[in-house]
């Protein structure tokens, strides 16, 4: 995972929730809760923030 210091974005696209870690690295999830949990775990480990876009 990139450690760019940029926030990790969580957003909905069509029926999926996506986590954008930066530098073109994304991850698909079927629920907002799953996406936020994945983003939070990486953010905590790397000292980054999470931005959820409605």
Question: What do these predicted ranges mean?
Answer:
Residues 7-8, 20-22:
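Ser/Thr-rich low-complexity repeats and stalk/linker segments
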């Amino acid at each position: 995972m990139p450690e760019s210091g940029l926030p990790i974005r969580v957003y909905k696209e069509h029926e999926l929730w996506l986590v954008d870690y930066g530098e073109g690295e994304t991850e698909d999830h079927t629920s907002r809760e799953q996406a936020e949990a994945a983003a939070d775990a990486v953010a905590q480990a790397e000292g980054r923030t999470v931005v959820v876009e409605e």
